[in-house]
Amino acid sequence: MTTPADDQGKSPENPWPVRAVATRVAKYIDRLGMVWIEGQLTELKIRQTTAWMVLRDPAADMSLSVSCPRDLVANAPVPLSEGTQVIVLGKPQFYTRNGSFSLRISEIRAVGIGELLARIDRLRRLLDAEGLFDPRLKRPIPFLPGTIGLITGRASHAERDVMTVAANRWPAVRFAVRNPIVQGPNAVPQIVGALRELDRDPGVDVIVLARGGGSVEDLLPFSDETLCREIASCTTPVVSAVGHEPDNPLCDLVADLRAATPTDAAKRVVPDAAAEQAFVTDLRRRSARALRQWVHREQHHLDQLRSRPVLARPLQAIDARADEVHRAVAAARRDVRRMVTVESERVGHLSARLTALGPAATLARGYAVVQTMPDTNVLRTTADAPAGTRLRIRVADGAITAVSEGTDEAH
Protein backbone atom coordinates (compact mmCIF):
# COMPACT_ATOMS: atom_id res chain seq x y z
CA MET A 1 0.00 0.00 0.00
CA THR A 2 1.46 3.34 -1.11
CA THR A 3 1.37 6.47 0.94
CA PRO A 4 0.92 10.04 -0.30
CA ALA A 5 4.62 10.58 0.32
CA ASP A 6 5.50 7.72 -2.04
CA ASP A 7 3.42 9.27 -4.82
CA GLN A 8 4.94 12.71 -4.40
CA GLY A 9 6.74 13.93 -7.51
CA LYS A 10 5.13 11.38 -9.81
CA SER A 11 2.30 13.54 -11.11
CA PRO A 12 1.67 17.21 -11.75
CA GLU A 13 -0.95 17.15 -9.02
CA ASN A 14 1.58 16.11 -6.39
CA PRO A 15 4.96 17.71 -7.30
CA TRP A 16 8.08 17.94 -5.17
CA PRO A 17 9.17 21.31 -3.90
CA VAL A 18 12.64 22.51 -4.97
CA ARG A 19 14.01 22.11 -1.44
CA ALA A 20 13.01 18.44 -1.37
CA VAL A 21 14.74 17.68 -4.66
CA ALA A 22 17.85 19.65 -3.68
CA THR A 23 18.02 17.88 -0.32
CA ARG A 24 17.69 14.44 -1.90
CA VAL A 25 20.39 15.21 -4.51
CA ALA A 26 22.70 16.54 -1.77
CA LYS A 27 22.21 13.39 0.31
CA TYR A 28 22.89 11.14 -2.69
CA ILE A 29 26.08 13.00 -3.64
CA ASP A 30 27.20 13.06 -0.02
CA ARG A 31 27.14 9.26 0.01
CA LEU A 32 29.78 9.15 -2.76
CA GLY A 33 32.51 9.89 -0.27
CA MET A 34 36.09 10.78 -1.27
CA VAL A 35 37.14 10.08 -4.89
CA TRP A 36 40.33 10.41 -6.92
CA ILE A 37 39.88 12.43 -10.13
CA GLU A 38 42.27 13.32 -12.97
CA GLY A 39 42.06 16.33 -15.26
CA GLN A 40 43.66 19.54 -16.47
CA LEU A 41 43.66 22.70 -14.38
CA THR A 42 42.03 25.76 -15.91
CA GLU A 43 40.89 29.13 -14.58
CA LEU A 44 43.05 28.95 -11.46
CA LYS A 45 42.12 31.76 -9.06
CA ILE A 46 43.66 32.16 -5.60
CA ARG A 47 41.90 34.23 -2.97
CA GLN A 48 42.90 35.00 0.61
CA THR A 49 42.08 31.60 2.05
CA THR A 50 40.64 29.57 -0.82
CA ALA A 51 41.81 28.59 -4.28
CA TRP A 52 39.23 28.13 -7.03
CA MET A 53 39.86 26.28 -10.26
CA VAL A 54 38.19 24.25 -12.97
CA LEU A 55 39.21 20.64 -13.54
CA ARG A 56 38.70 19.78 -17.21
CA ASP A 57 38.60 16.54 -19.19
CA PRO A 58 39.91 17.50 -22.67
CA ALA A 59 38.89 14.21 -24.23
CA ALA A 60 35.21 14.71 -23.40
CA ASP A 61 35.13 18.52 -23.23
CA MET A 62 33.64 18.38 -19.71
CA SER A 63 34.65 20.34 -16.63
CA LEU A 64 34.11 20.41 -12.89
CA SER A 65 34.39 23.28 -10.41
CA VAL A 66 36.98 22.66 -7.69
CA SER A 67 37.90 24.46 -4.49
CA CYS A 68 40.61 23.86 -1.91
CA PRO A 69 42.54 25.71 0.80
CA ARG A 70 45.01 28.19 -0.61
CA ASP A 71 47.92 26.49 1.15
CA LEU A 72 47.21 23.25 -0.75
CA VAL A 73 48.11 24.98 -4.02
CA ALA A 74 50.98 26.96 -2.56
CA ASN A 75 52.59 23.85 -1.02
CA ALA A 76 52.13 21.60 -4.08
CA PRO A 77 55.26 19.53 -4.97
CA VAL A 78 55.50 21.32 -8.34
CA PRO A 79 54.17 24.75 -9.34
CA LEU A 80 50.59 24.52 -10.55
CA SER A 81 49.36 26.55 -13.49
CA GLU A 82 46.65 26.41 -16.10
CA GLY A 83 47.11 23.35 -18.29
CA THR A 84 48.83 21.26 -15.63
CA GLN A 85 47.66 17.66 -15.60
CA VAL A 86 46.77 16.76 -12.00
CA ILE A 87 45.25 14.02 -9.86
CA VAL A 88 43.16 15.25 -6.93
CA LEU A 89 41.45 13.65 -3.95
CA GLY A 90 38.19 15.33 -3.11
CA LYS A 91 34.63 15.04 -1.91
CA PRO A 92 31.77 15.95 -4.27
CA GLN A 93 29.43 18.55 -2.81
CA PHE A 94 26.03 19.82 -3.84
CA TYR A 95 24.99 23.25 -2.57
CA THR A 96 21.25 23.24 -2.04
CA ARG A 97 21.01 27.03 -1.82
CA ASN A 98 21.97 27.66 -5.46
CA GLY A 99 21.85 24.12 -6.88
CA SER A 100 25.54 24.07 -7.83
CA PHE A 101 27.90 21.10 -7.83
CA SER A 102 31.53 21.37 -6.80
CA LEU A 103 34.46 19.31 -5.61
CA ARG A 104 36.25 20.13 -2.37
CA ILE A 105 39.73 18.63 -2.59
CA SER A 106 42.14 17.79 0.20
CA GLU A 107 45.08 16.50 -1.86
CA ILE A 108 46.53 17.43 -5.24
CA ARG A 109 49.30 15.82 -7.26
CA ALA A 110 50.81 16.91 -10.55
CA VAL A 111 51.16 14.14 -13.11
CA GLY A 112 54.88 13.66 -13.78
CA ILE A 113 56.61 13.50 -17.16
CA GLY A 114 57.20 9.79 -16.76
CA GLU A 115 53.53 9.11 -16.16
CA LEU A 116 52.54 11.30 -19.14
CA LEU A 117 54.94 9.44 -21.42
CA ALA A 118 53.67 6.10 -20.15
CA ARG A 119 50.06 7.11 -20.88
CA ILE A 120 51.02 8.31 -24.35
CA ASP A 121 52.74 4.99 -24.98
CA ARG A 122 49.67 3.05 -23.84
CA LEU A 123 47.49 5.12 -26.15
CA ARG A 124 49.96 4.59 -28.98
CA ARG A 125 49.71 0.81 -28.58
CA LEU A 126 45.90 1.01 -28.46
CA LEU A 127 45.63 3.08 -31.64
CA ASP A 128 48.18 0.89 -33.39
CA ALA A 129 46.21 -2.22 -32.48
CA GLU A 130 43.10 -0.61 -33.97
CA GLY A 131 44.95 -0.01 -37.25
CA LEU A 132 45.02 3.80 -37.16
CA PHE A 133 48.73 3.79 -38.08
CA ASP A 134 48.33 1.38 -41.01
CA PRO A 135 50.29 2.75 -44.02
CA ARG A 136 47.61 1.35 -46.35
CA LEU A 137 45.13 3.88 -44.92
CA LYS A 138 47.32 6.87 -45.76
CA ARG A 139 45.72 9.19 -48.30
CA PRO A 140 47.97 10.56 -51.08
CA ILE A 141 48.97 14.22 -50.93
CA PRO A 142 47.90 16.12 -54.09
CA PHE A 143 50.78 17.25 -56.31
CA LEU A 144 49.54 20.82 -56.60
CA PRO A 145 46.87 21.72 -54.00
CA GLY A 146 44.63 24.62 -54.90
CA THR A 147 43.89 25.56 -51.28
CA ILE A 148 45.82 24.46 -48.20
CA GLY A 149 44.06 24.32 -44.86
CA LEU A 150 46.46 25.51 -42.15
CA ILE A 151 45.80 24.92 -38.44
CA THR A 152 48.33 26.69 -36.25
CA GLY A 153 48.70 29.26 -33.50
CA ARG A 154 47.87 32.86 -34.35
CA ALA A 155 50.91 34.88 -35.50
CA SER A 156 53.16 31.94 -34.62
CA HIS A 157 56.53 31.13 -36.16
CA ALA A 158 54.95 27.98 -37.57
CA GLU A 159 52.29 30.00 -39.41
CA ARG A 160 54.89 32.40 -40.78
CA ASP A 161 57.25 29.62 -41.87
CA VAL A 162 54.59 27.58 -43.66
CA MET A 163 53.03 30.51 -45.52
CA THR A 164 56.35 32.16 -46.42
CA VAL A 165 58.02 29.01 -47.71
CA ALA A 166 54.89 27.94 -49.60
CA ALA A 167 54.47 31.36 -51.24
CA ASN A 168 58.14 31.40 -52.26
CA ARG A 169 57.82 27.98 -53.84
CA TRP A 170 54.45 28.54 -55.55
CA PRO A 171 53.18 32.15 -55.45
CA ALA A 172 49.64 31.21 -56.55
CA VAL A 173 49.03 28.95 -53.54
CA ARG A 174 46.01 29.80 -51.36
CA PHE A 175 45.50 29.20 -47.64
CA ALA A 176 42.47 28.67 -45.41
CA VAL A 177 43.95 29.47 -42.00
CA ARG A 178 42.44 28.55 -38.64
CA ASN A 179 44.10 29.78 -35.43
CA PRO A 180 43.02 27.70 -32.43
CA ILE A 181 44.87 27.56 -29.13
CA VAL A 182 47.66 25.01 -29.62
CA GLN A 183 48.52 24.25 -25.99
CA GLY A 184 46.73 24.11 -22.70
CA PRO A 185 43.42 22.59 -21.62
CA ASN A 186 41.33 24.26 -24.34
CA ALA A 187 43.61 23.30 -27.22
CA VAL A 188 42.10 19.93 -28.15
CA PRO A 189 38.46 21.01 -28.69
CA GLN A 190 39.55 24.08 -30.66
CA ILE A 191 41.95 22.10 -32.86
CA VAL A 192 39.34 19.40 -33.43
CA GLY A 193 36.76 22.05 -34.36
CA ALA A 194 39.15 23.67 -36.85
CA LEU A 195 39.98 20.26 -38.33
CA ARG A 196 36.31 19.40 -38.82
CA GLU A 197 35.59 22.77 -40.40
CA LEU A 198 38.40 22.48 -42.94
CA ASP A 199 37.60 18.84 -43.70
CA ARG A 200 34.04 19.82 -44.60
CA ASP A 201 35.27 22.53 -47.00
CA PRO A 202 35.31 21.00 -50.52
CA GLY A 203 37.79 23.65 -51.68
CA VAL A 204 40.51 22.50 -49.26
CA ASP A 205 42.78 19.88 -50.85
CA VAL A 206 45.13 19.19 -47.92
CA ILE A 207 45.28 20.18 -44.24
CA VAL A 208 48.52 21.07 -42.46
CA LEU A 209 48.57 20.84 -38.65
CA ALA A 210 51.57 22.93 -37.59
CA ARG A 211 53.15 23.91 -34.30
CA GLY A 212 56.67 24.73 -33.20
CA GLY A 213 58.63 22.76 -30.64
CA GLY A 214 57.94 22.65 -26.93
CA SER A 215 57.96 20.54 -23.82
CA VAL A 216 56.06 17.30 -23.40
CA GLU A 217 53.31 19.21 -21.61
CA ASP A 218 53.15 21.81 -24.39
CA LEU A 219 52.76 19.15 -27.08
CA LEU A 220 50.37 17.00 -25.03
CA PRO A 221 47.24 18.07 -26.99
CA PHE A 222 48.75 16.58 -30.16
CA SER A 223 48.88 13.15 -28.51
CA ASP A 224 45.26 13.38 -27.39
CA GLU A 225 43.06 10.43 -28.32
CA THR A 226 40.17 12.62 -29.51
CA LEU A 227 42.41 14.54 -31.91
CA CYS A 228 44.08 11.38 -33.21
CA ARG A 229 40.76 9.74 -33.99
CA GLU A 230 39.49 12.92 -35.66
CA ILE A 231 42.55 12.99 -37.94
CA ALA A 232 41.98 9.33 -38.84
CA SER A 233 38.35 10.03 -39.76
CA CYS A 234 39.14 12.97 -42.08
CA THR A 235 38.49 12.56 -45.80
CA THR A 236 41.00 15.30 -46.63
CA PRO A 237 44.71 14.35 -46.43
CA VAL A 238 46.31 15.64 -43.21
CA VAL A 239 49.97 16.60 -42.79
CA SER A 240 51.36 16.71 -39.25
CA ALA A 241 54.14 19.24 -38.67
CA VAL A 242 54.25 19.45 -34.88
CA GLY A 243 57.43 20.25 -32.99
CA HIS A 244 60.92 19.59 -34.26
CA GLU A 245 62.64 16.46 -35.56
CA PRO A 246 63.05 14.70 -32.17
CA ASP A 247 59.43 15.33 -31.18
CA ASN A 248 57.03 12.54 -32.02
CA PRO A 249 53.43 13.22 -30.92
CA LEU A 250 50.83 10.61 -31.78
CA CYS A 251 49.23 12.80 -34.42
CA ASP A 252 52.40 12.25 -36.50
CA LEU A 253 51.62 8.54 -36.66
CA VAL A 254 47.95 8.96 -37.56
CA ALA A 255 48.43 11.70 -40.16
CA ASP A 256 48.82 10.85 -43.84
CA LEU A 257 52.22 12.53 -43.93
CA ARG A 258 54.64 13.47 -41.15
CA ALA A 259 56.83 16.52 -41.69
CA ALA A 260 59.86 17.14 -39.48
CA THR A 261 59.06 20.86 -39.08
CA PRO A 262 56.47 23.36 -40.35
CA THR A 263 59.02 24.49 -42.95
CA ASP A 264 59.44 20.90 -44.09
CA ALA A 265 55.65 20.58 -44.36
CA ALA A 266 55.48 23.54 -46.73
CA LYS A 267 58.23 22.03 -48.89
CA ARG A 268 56.55 18.64 -49.05
CA VAL A 269 53.05 19.94 -49.74
CA VAL A 270 53.82 22.71 -52.26
CA PRO A 271 56.03 22.03 -55.31
CA ASP A 272 58.84 24.47 -56.07
CA ALA A 273 57.74 26.48 -59.12
CA ALA A 274 61.32 27.40 -60.02
CA ALA A 275 62.47 23.80 -59.70
CA GLU A 276 59.52 22.52 -61.72
CA GLN A 277 60.16 25.16 -64.40
CA ALA A 278 63.82 24.19 -64.51
CA PHE A 279 62.81 20.54 -64.74
CA VAL A 280 60.45 21.24 -67.65
CA THR A 281 63.12 23.36 -69.38
CA ASP A 282 65.64 20.58 -68.96
CA LEU A 283 63.18 18.04 -70.34
CA ARG A 284 62.52 20.22 -73.38
CA ARG A 285 66.24 20.72 -73.94
CA ARG A 286 66.97 17.01 -73.66
CA SER A 287 64.01 16.16 -75.90
CA ALA A 288 65.18 18.64 -78.55
CA ARG A 289 68.71 17.25 -78.38
CA ALA A 290 67.47 13.68 -78.68
CA LEU A 291 65.29 14.66 -81.66
CA ARG A 292 68.18 16.40 -83.41
CA GLN A 293 70.42 13.39 -82.84
CA TRP A 294 67.77 11.07 -84.24
CA VAL A 295 67.27 13.25 -87.34
CA HIS A 296 71.05 13.44 -87.87
CA ARG A 297 71.42 9.69 -87.46
CA GLU A 298 68.59 8.93 -89.88
CA GLN A 299 69.88 11.50 -92.37
CA HIS A 300 73.31 9.88 -92.27
CA HIS A 301 71.75 6.47 -92.81
CA LEU A 302 69.73 7.84 -95.75
CA ASP A 303 72.88 9.36 -97.28
CA GLN A 304 74.60 5.99 -97.03
CA LEU A 305 71.70 4.33 -98.80
CA ARG A 306 71.64 6.95 -101.54
CA SER A 307 75.38 6.58 -102.14
CA ARG A 308 75.09 2.89 -103.02
CA PRO A 309 75.61 2.06 -106.75
CA VAL A 310 72.32 0.27 -106.95
CA LEU A 311 70.50 3.51 -106.20
CA ALA A 312 72.48 5.39 -108.93
CA ARG A 313 70.69 3.22 -111.58
CA PRO A 314 67.79 1.73 -109.61
CA LEU A 315 66.17 0.15 -112.73
CA GLN A 316 69.30 -1.77 -113.73
CA ALA A 317 68.59 -4.58 -111.33
CA ILE A 318 64.97 -4.65 -112.43
CA ASP A 319 65.95 -4.79 -116.11
CA ALA A 320 68.36 -7.64 -115.43
CA ARG A 321 65.72 -9.56 -113.58
CA ALA A 322 63.19 -8.79 -116.33
CA ASP A 323 65.51 -10.32 -118.96
CA GLU A 324 65.88 -13.38 -116.79
CA VAL A 325 62.11 -13.63 -116.50
CA HIS A 326 61.65 -13.31 -120.27
CA ARG A 327 64.22 -16.03 -120.93
CA ALA A 328 62.62 -18.27 -118.35
CA VAL A 329 59.18 -17.74 -119.91
CA ALA A 330 60.47 -18.55 -123.41
CA ALA A 331 62.22 -21.67 -122.17
CA ALA A 332 59.08 -22.74 -120.35
CA ARG A 333 57.01 -22.26 -123.48
CA ARG A 334 59.44 -24.35 -125.55
CA ASP A 335 59.43 -27.07 -122.96
CA VAL A 336 55.65 -27.09 -122.83
CA ARG A 337 55.33 -27.27 -126.63
CA ARG A 338 57.87 -30.08 -126.81
CA MET A 339 56.13 -31.97 -124.04
CA VAL A 340 52.73 -31.51 -125.74
CA THR A 341 54.12 -32.82 -129.07
CA VAL A 342 55.71 -35.86 -127.46
CA GLU A 343 52.60 -36.69 -125.48
CA SER A 344 50.36 -36.15 -128.51
CA GLU A 345 52.39 -38.66 -130.54
CA ARG A 346 52.24 -41.10 -127.65
CA VAL A 347 48.47 -40.70 -127.41
CA GLY A 348 48.21 -41.32 -131.21
CA HIS A 349 50.16 -44.55 -130.96
CA LEU A 350 48.05 -45.74 -128.05
CA SER A 351 44.85 -44.85 -129.94
CA ALA A 352 45.97 -46.84 -133.00
CA ARG A 353 46.74 -49.85 -130.85
CA LEU A 354 43.36 -49.60 -129.16
CA THR A 355 41.65 -49.37 -132.55
CA ALA A 356 43.48 -52.43 -133.87
CA LEU A 357 42.69 -54.45 -130.80
CA GLY A 358 39.10 -53.22 -130.40
CA PRO A 359 35.84 -54.90 -131.63
CA ALA A 360 35.30 -52.25 -134.32
CA ALA A 361 38.28 -53.54 -136.31
CA THR A 362 36.97 -57.10 -136.09
CA LEU A 363 33.54 -55.99 -137.32
CA ALA A 364 35.17 -54.14 -140.20
CA ARG A 365 36.68 -57.42 -141.37
CA GLY A 366 33.12 -58.92 -141.85
CA TYR A 367 32.34 -60.26 -138.45
CA ALA A 368 29.15 -59.53 -136.48
CA VAL A 369 28.10 -59.57 -132.84
CA VAL A 370 24.69 -61.14 -132.08
CA GLN A 371 22.85 -60.19 -128.88
CA THR A 372 19.60 -61.51 -127.47
CA MET A 373 16.90 -58.97 -126.72
CA PRO A 374 16.01 -57.37 -124.51
CA ASP A 375 18.76 -58.37 -122.09
CA THR A 376 21.50 -57.63 -124.73
CA ASN A 377 23.49 -60.71 -123.77
CA VAL A 378 25.99 -61.84 -126.42
CA LEU A 379 24.81 -64.99 -128.19
CA ARG A 380 27.43 -67.69 -127.70
CA THR A 381 25.57 -70.98 -128.50
CA THR A 382 22.49 -71.95 -130.51
CA ALA A 383 20.86 -72.98 -127.29
CA ASP A 384 20.75 -69.32 -126.28
CA ALA A 385 18.48 -68.48 -129.29
CA PRO A 386 15.52 -70.84 -129.55
CA ALA A 387 12.84 -70.09 -132.12
CA GLY A 388 11.12 -66.78 -131.53
CA THR A 389 14.05 -65.12 -129.76
CA ARG A 390 14.48 -61.51 -130.81
CA LEU A 391 18.06 -60.79 -131.86
CA ARG A 392 20.18 -57.70 -132.41
CA ILE A 393 22.96 -58.19 -134.94
CA ARG A 394 25.72 -55.55 -134.76
CA VAL A 395 27.90 -55.11 -137.88
CA ALA A 396 30.59 -52.57 -138.78
CA ASP A 397 28.23 -49.83 -139.92
CA GLY A 398 25.24 -50.45 -137.60
CA ALA A 399 22.86 -53.03 -136.19
CA ILE A 400 20.10 -55.29 -137.56
CA THR A 401 17.07 -56.65 -135.64
CA ALA A 402 15.99 -60.25 -136.40
CA VAL A 403 13.93 -63.13 -134.97
CA SER A 404 15.32 -66.68 -134.57
CA GLU A 405 13.38 -69.35 -136.52
CA GLY A 406 15.18 -72.22 -134.90
CA THR A 407 18.54 -73.93 -135.09
CA ASP A 408 20.32 -75.97 -137.77
CA GLU A 409 22.55 -78.90 -137.13
CA ALA A 410 26.18 -78.16 -137.54
CA HIS A 411 27.75 -79.56 -140.66
UniProtKB/Swiss-Prot annotation:
Function (record text): Bidirectionally degrades single-stranded DNA into large acid-insoluble oligonucleotides, which are then degraded further into small acid-soluble oligonucleotides.
Any one Gene Ontology BP term: DNA catabolic process
Xref: HAMAP family: Exonuc_7_L
Localization of this protein: Cytoplasm
GO cellular component: cytoplasm; exodeoxyribonuclease VII complex
Source organism of this protein record: Mycobacterium sp. (strain JLS)
Binding partners and assembly: Heterooligomer composed of large and small subunits.
Protein name as catalogued: Exodeoxyribonuclease 7 large subunit
Reaction catalysis annotation: Exonucleolytic cleavage in either 5'- to 3'- or 3'- to 5'-direction to yield nucleoside 5'-phosphates
InterPro entries: Exonuc_VII_L, Exonuc_VII_lsu_C, OB-fold_nuc-bd_dom
Gene Ontology MF, one: nucleic acid binding
Protein family according to the UniProt entry: Belongs to the XseA family.
Database matches in Pfam families: Exonuc_VII_L, tRNA_anti_2
Keywords for this protein: Cytoplasm, Exonuclease, Hydrolase, Nuclease
UniProt keyword Hydrolase, yes or no: yes
Record flagged with keyword Hydrolase: yes
E.C. number(s) listed in UniProt: 3.1.11.6
Lineage of origin: Bacteria, Bacillati, Actinomycetota, Actinomycetes, Mycobacteriales
